[in-house]
Amino acid sequence: MFDLLRELGIKSFSFRAITDNAQVAETVKQCGVDRIDLSGCHVDYDDPASQERVIETYRAAGVKITGIGVVQLKDDEAFNRRYFEFARRAGCDVVSCSFQPDGYESTLRITERLCDEYGMRAPIHNHGGAHWLGNATILDYLFRNTQPTIGLCLDTAWCLHAGEDPVKWTERFADRLYGIHFKDFVFDRKGKVTDVVIGEGALDLPALLKAFAAAPFNGSAVIEYEGEDAVDAIPRCVAAIRRLI
């Protein structure tokens, strides 16, 4: 059973302004957690030597890498393989992804093969109402036409941005939920979004955590906060979640 109290982590994109991975690891631990989902701003997928240094930096700091992404997959097996190779060496099995509509079927067949080969899961990240993978209809279609290794990386705030309900998504896609970005927005009258401490915006955090606890989850569960005050805000996000567990 997934223990969110202990296994909650942080999406490294939240700390994209910090380029030194040792400092990122230290900041993660200062937030009261010891897990991270690595974004491309903190790893070079074309440089295996630097990748090993990244992995060792987090290992030495006692910070577990629970996933990577969001990576942009293509209809190109060699290109996509780089991500799975890194994930295997990093000791995680979640490669959150996105891809373009052109050639999507071939991209997914390649991804399924790589998941099987590497023992990975590739959850699709929903990125708001303007993104073609940001609505439940297309996600349901894709899940019905792919192997179970293809799932959902639920970004709760971007789900809200699409006019959808992350609580219902958590329930509907429970069996394919392999990643979650706990994130919250407030919306102004024109629909412009601002990151806020989770639970202080449009997200029904108590209902989400109840649905999450009922799901058979075993993946990468992280807080993501994209505001410039992330170092100050994320400890409050951690506390907000832990108060309700």
Q: What are these language model-derived features?
A:
Residues 42, 74, 101, 186, ...:
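Flexible, active-site-proximal loop/turn residues at the rims of small-molecule/cofactor binding pockets
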Residues 13, 39-41, 70-71:
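Acidic/polar N-terminal loop/beta-strand segments that form early-domain functional surfaces
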Residues 46-52, 77-80, 232-233:
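Metal-dependent catalytic neighborhoods of phosphoester/phosphodiester hydrolases
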Residues 37-55:
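Glycine-rich, proline-tolerant flexible connector loops at the mouths of alpha/beta enzymes
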Residues 19-22, 26, 35, 57-152, ...:
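Active-site acidic/histidine proton-transfer and metal-coordination neighborhood
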Residues 41-42, 128, 182-184:
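Short, acidic/turn-prone active-site loops that include or flank metal/cofactor-
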Residues 1-9, 14-34, 77, 91, ...:
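Histidine-acidic metal/acid-base catalytic patches
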Residues 45, 104, 189:
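Short glycine-rich, flexible loops that bind phosphorylated cofactors or substrates
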